[in-house]
């Protein structure tokens, strides 16, 4: 039964899902029309909101590009390749490979979402090289499914913003919060840990059960990571390019920075810190600046989709939050609609569902928090719902629909060498399963 459902889902996605870039363009037009109709703003005003937002994610675009490039370059280092290949020999069957890659991606995403995306993709490539008969699209989809738990983990932007406190917190929560809420009440709350535990057990089993009868096997030779060859050094400048000493000096400087950072801030893993770790670990593993740059040049081919498409999603976000003369925006109207249907018991679930819907159009935890936080937290407080519960419901909604949002799949797909159509059929079933788990946890455990 599940195989038939999976096959139908994969067929429908491959038949009707447009390419990620076309998807972003169509989404832009849908939001444009919806915002004009719901807020009464004309085309010139919406074009202004779109244009004002279009370049708002430039820094984030660079971060995403760097995490893909540095992570992939690190994975191409000889020592890392050998480690991944040894781990990839552990599974003795395609099903075991599916389970293992899901668990690795889940663990990585719980630690840091960027790390989870990269390590899941590179490990999927390693498994496809080693395990005969494994379905490569399902393997990559399984790696992506691990991303589902990121907002319940250490890099979750919403719980971390609650823990930071300050004037920004009061503004972002519509005045519902004036003091910080520690991660003990969010990330380490019992309901959050139970939701994560159920997903950690359930997702690997679901992915294992979705194995097709006729797997799409990729030629392992196509996934081999080319290793840079040594080039004879005849001049002083050429020998300098291939100097291990220069690389080690920069790595030592980075280690000193990391020591001070973690001593002062604890295990605080920001996106910039993760990128820095990938970059200097890659430089160390490749040995010389010249070899590392050749690995970077090979890895940089996968960022085209990120560079072109992220500005379109920034423009969509601009239209979602662009308000008319009386302060009404499409994002606010979507959120208000869910609020009016809520009771004290159902509010966390409806907050989760509304966040999942808004996330399709505003695929950024920070952007979504800016749209929904000032509306949802005061509404929840009026119904007697704890603010940390409302915040985590929004966080889980943001993480939930990422599984069907090509925006977040682009880094992983760039490393894996697949298109969104190849994995989204499997991701749809992960969406349904995880939605039931998360909604159930929020309803019965909060």
Task: State what each model feature region is.
Residues 19, 55-61, 88-100, 130-139, ...:
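Membrane-interfacial loop-to-helix junctions in multi-pass transporters
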Residues 124-217, 408-441:
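Membrane-core helix-loop-helix motifs of multi-pass transport proteins
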Residues 1-120, 124-149, 153, 209-226, ...:
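N-terminal alpha-helical transmembrane segments of multi-pass membrane transport
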Residues 90-123, 310-324, 335-378, 383:
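Hydrophobic alpha-helical transmembrane segments of multi-pass integral membrane proteins
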């Amino acid at each position: 039964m599940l195989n038939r459902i999976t096959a139908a889902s994969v067929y429908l996605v491959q038949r009707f899902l447009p390419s990620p870039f076309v998807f972003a363009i169509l989404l832009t037009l849908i939001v444009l029309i919806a915002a004009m109709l719901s807020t009464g703003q004309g085309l010139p005003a919406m074009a202004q909101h779109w244009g004002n937002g279009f370049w708002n994610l430039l820094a984030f675009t660079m971060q995403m590009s760097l995490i893909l490039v540095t992570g992939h370059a690190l994975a191409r280092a000889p020592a890392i390749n050998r480690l991944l290949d040894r781990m990839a020999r552990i599974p003795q069957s395609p099903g075991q490979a599916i389970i293992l890659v899901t668990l690795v991606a889940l663990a990585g995403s719980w630690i840091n979402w960027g790390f989870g995306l990269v390590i899941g993709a590179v490990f999927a490539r390693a498994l496809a090289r080693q395990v005969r008969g494994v379905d490569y699209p399902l393997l990559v989809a399984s790696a992506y499914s691990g991303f589902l738990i990121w907002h319940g983990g250490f890099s979750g932007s919403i719980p971390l913003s609650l823990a930071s406190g300050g004037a920004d917190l009061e503004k972002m929560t519509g005045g519902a919060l004036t003091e910080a809420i520690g991660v003990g009440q969010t990330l380490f709350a019992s309901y959050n840990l139970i939701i994560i535990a159920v997903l950690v057990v359930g997702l690997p089993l679901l992915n294992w059960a979705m194995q097709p009868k006729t797997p799409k096997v990729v030629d392992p030779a196509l996934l081999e990571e080319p290793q840079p060859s040594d080039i004879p050094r005849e001049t002083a400048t050429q020998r300098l390019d291939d100097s291990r000493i220069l690389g080690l000096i920069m790595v030592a400087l980075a280690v000193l920075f990391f020591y001070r950072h973690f001593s002062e801030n604890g295990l605080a893993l920001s996106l910039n810190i993760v990128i820095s770790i990938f970059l200097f670990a890659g430089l160390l593993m490749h040995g010389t600046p010249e070899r590392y740059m050749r690995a970077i040049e090979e890895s940089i081919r996968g960022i085209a989709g990120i560079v072109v498409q992220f500005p379109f999603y920034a423009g969509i976000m601009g239209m979602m939050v662009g308000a008319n003369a009386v302060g009404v925006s499409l994002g606010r109207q979507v959120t208000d609609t869910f609020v009016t249907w809520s009771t004290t018991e159902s509010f966390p679930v409806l907050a989760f569902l509304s966040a999942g819907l808004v996330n399709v159009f505003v695929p950024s935890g920070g952007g979504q928090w800016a749209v929904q936080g000032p509306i949802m937290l005061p509404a929840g407080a009026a119904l007697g719902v704890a603010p940390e519960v409302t915040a985590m419901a929004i966080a889980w909604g943001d993480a939930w629909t990422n599984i069907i949002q090509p925006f977040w799949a682009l880094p992983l797909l760039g490393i894996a060498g697949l298109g969104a159509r190849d994995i989204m059929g499997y991701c749809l079933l992960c969406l349904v399963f995880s939605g039931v788990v998360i909604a159930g946890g929020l309803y019965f455990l909060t």
